[in-house]
Amino acid sequence: MTVRFLFEALNMAIDEEMARNDKVALLGEDIGHYGGSYKVTQNLYAKYGEHRVIDTPIAENSFVGAAIGAAMTGLVTVVEGMNMGFILLAFSQISNNMGMLSATSGGHYHIPIVLRGPGGVGKQLGAEHSQRLECYFQSVPGLQIVACSTPYNAKGLLKSAIRSKNPIFFLEHVLLYNLKAEVPDNDYVLPLEKAEIVRQGNDITILTYSRMRYNVIQAVKVLVEKGYDPEIIDLISLKPFDIETIGKSIQKTHKVLIVEESMMTGGISNVLQSLILENFFDDLDNRPMCLSSPNVPTPYSGPLEEVSIVQTADIIESVEQILTNKM
């Protein structure tokens, strides 16, 4: 075990998979000589060369399309979006080709492609660089969505994503790259469709993912001091959801709070709330509560940015409302 930053764990995952499979190739802006904006691809250009680590023009629609075409011919392509907000420029390729080609070709083609990069609300990156695209991509048929949250699961999940035959949107939060934790030095993979029980509890199920995992953990420390016993589940797989793990927790606690950084309208919490009501209605003491960001562009101002997303105090207040029947 070695203590590593999350960006280093991602770098290790890519390096190991490129060494394991010579069909793995990287595409993206400044991923070669520069090593990527957040150094996830550092040293890979020198090790594997320009034919496998490809610096692209600033043309997201074109290089995502090229990566899809390469995947159709047998390569495994890992595409970095310098910022996930820019990937919106490739939405046609992602929706019409990356997600659906396997089905529309009758299974003739597999599209082994991982679309990864920084997203989420950062420190004063402005509205255009604070996009949360998991909501947009929820409706794309054939596309899996995975959100890493620790150095350990970042490495194991990315390795699994690269080995998958399916197209995967791999979400990395911009504020988690410098998170440090122990990472095994050996080769390991983690299941892409399995949630993680971060803390076991009996009073309420709190479902969350990515950066909000840490806001929830901080809130639960306060709640435990007040005598509450919440269960925390990191969803990890945002499409499909690990409905088995979620369901077992709900059948134990009978109460649910969903915490996300995304906006509620069209957000992850809306979809998950519907699934919970459809599958576990009789197990609930009250309706699942969704705690999401307001439907506004992310402000550049630091203080305004802070109030534009869910804070620890909001989580504490929501849990107490649910557990005291004051919803």
Swiss-Prot record:
- State if Thylakoid is listed as a keyword: no
GO MF annotations, alphabetized? metal ion binding; pyruvate dehydrogenase (acetyl-transferring) activity
Looking up Pfam families in the UniProt record yields: Transket_pyr (PF02779), Transketolase_C (PF02780)
The catalytic activity, as recorded, is: N(6)-[(R)-lipoyl]-L-lysyl-[protein] + pyruvate + H(+) = N(6)-[(R)-S(8)-acetyldihydrolipoyl]-L-lysyl-[protein] + CO2
Listed GO cellular component terms?
chloroplast
What residues does K(+) bind to?
A: I113, A161, I162, N166
Subunit composition and interactions: Heterodimer of an alpha and a beta chain.
Q: What is this protein called?
A: Pyruvate dehydrogenase E1 component subunit beta
Q: Which organism is it from?
A: Mesostigma viride (Green alga)
Q: Which gene encodes it?
A: pdhB
